[in-house]
Swiss-Prot record:
Protein name: Putative protein C31H2.4
Record keywords: Iron, Metal-binding, Repeat
InterPro entries on file: 4OHPhenylPyrv_dOase, 4OHPhenylPyrv_dOase_C, 4OHPhenylPyrv_dOase_N, Glyas_Bleomycin-R_OHBP_Dase, Glyas_Fos-R_dOase_dom, VOC
VOC domain sequence ranges: 6-134, 161-320
Gene3D superfamilies reported in the protein's UniProt record: 2,3-Dihydroxybiphenyl 1,2-Dioxygenase, domain 1 (3.10.180.10)
GO biological process, one term: tyrosine catabolic process
Entry binding sites for Fe cation: H164, H248, E331
């Protein structure tokens, strides 16, 4: 009681909602299905599987457009579903956590109650939704719309759900942020990666994975490490984003090879992984009894990362930054009886992003 049960949706603030919606539909298989238009803003709702994304743009200057100038297009809200909002609110009162906005909307489709919190140390908010028996298309005030016609007539790129989100923090602020999540949402620390793993000659980082009791909500927090001669990828994000924020979210898919092939055909670019990584992977796999149904040659060719244990494996791949600023990217992930988080790939991912930093000239 009094905890979150699932990611409901994420919301972007962008300069042009229609153009951004088209890009995410084109590259990542989303479809637009609902919209909310007011005198002040346009919001377009996208879906792929149960993953939901709202793309919002504003028509006049306000606090959100000021944040847009600061961050560029960015994820403003990571929303969660709760079963008992009253219990959550009581927990917030007990922990002296401020609710910045509450609403209760009753429509013919049912009752929706919300509470919005400002996260620790940044502009990201979390809206908590108690939906009960609500049977609407999406949320109150959103009306159904058709998808872009083009994407109704080309190959689909189906996702299952939104697997997790990752947020970056300035050096020294991650633990306070984690404590905020412990108190507000009753998340727990599941594992961590320190600067002995995510490290190079030039930079380092540390990260904590926070989960709810059922592991249906996974939030990773990351920060850079002091004392290195270069600038960590987390510090690069902080500089370009103008502070802490959501670095990426992950879409869970059933067939990552097919998904990546489709996305690459639509001009989505992914990080490249050295051949040595796959040589080592194949050697490690040869010493186990694990059966991998995917073609390892295709995994190598597509630059897909793999982590495994005695029970199963995980496949994951990371896009290059999706915007002019090297901030937001998207992860595609496939799980085969594997509940871990790709900890074995953290070093490979760290090195791949650092190589991109070096190309951009932002490592020093």
């Amino acid at each position: 009681m009094g905890s979150i049960s699932a990611i409901h949706h994420i919301e972007f603030i962008v300069s042009n909602a229609l153009q951004s919606a088209y890009w995410y539909c084109s590259g990542f298989g989303f479809e637009k299905f609902a919209e909310k238009i007011t005198d002040e803003s346009t919001s377009i709702a996208l879906r792929n599987g149960t993953a939901r994304v709202i793309i919002t743009s504003y028509n006049s200057q306000n606090i959100y457009t000021d944040q847009l100038i600061k961050h560029g297009d960015f994820i403003k809200d990571v929303s969660f579903r709760v079963d008992n909002l009253d219990a959550v609110l009581q927990n917030l009162v007990e922990n002296d956590i401020k609710v910045i906005q509450q609403s209760e909307v009753s429509t013919k489709d049912g009752l929706v109650r919300t509470a919005t919190l400002l996260s620790e140390g940044g502009d990201v908010t979390h809206t908590l939704f108690e939906l009960g028996e609500f049977k609407g298309n999406f949320l109150p005030f959103f009306t159904p719309i058709s998808n872009f016609e083009l994407f109704e007539n080309i190959e689909k790129m189906p996702a299952i759900l939104m697997d997790h989100v990752v947020q970056n923090y300035p050096i020294g602020e991650m633990e306070a942020a984690a404590d905020w999540y412990f108190k507000t949402m009753r998340l727990k620390r599941f594992w961590s990666v320190d600067d002995k793993v995510a490290t190079s000659e030039f930079s380092a980082m540390t990260a904590w994975l926070l989960v709810n009791d059922d592991h249906t909500v996974q939030v990773t927090l990351a920060e850079g490490v002091k004392g290195r001669k270069g600038k960590s990828q987390i510090e690069e994000f902080i500089n370009y984003h103008g502070g802490s924020g959501v670095q990426h979210f992950a879409l869970l898919v059933e067939d990552i090879i097919s998904a990546v092939q489709i996305m690459k055909s639509r001009s989505v670019e992914f990080l490249t992984i050295p051949s040595q990584y796959y040589d080592n992977l194949e050697e490690r796999l040869s010493k186990t009894n694990l059966i991998v149904k995917e073609d390892l040659k295709m995994i190598r060719e597509l630059n897909i990362l793999m982590d495994f244990d005695e029970n199963g494996y995980l496949l994951q791949i990371f896009s290059k930054p999706l915007q002019d600023r090297p901030t937001l990217f998207i992860e595609i992930i496939q799980r085969a009886n594997f509940k871990g988080f790709g900890a074995g790939n953290f070093k490979a991912l760290f090195d791949a992003v650092e190589r991109e930093q070096e190309k951009r000239g932002t490592l020093f």
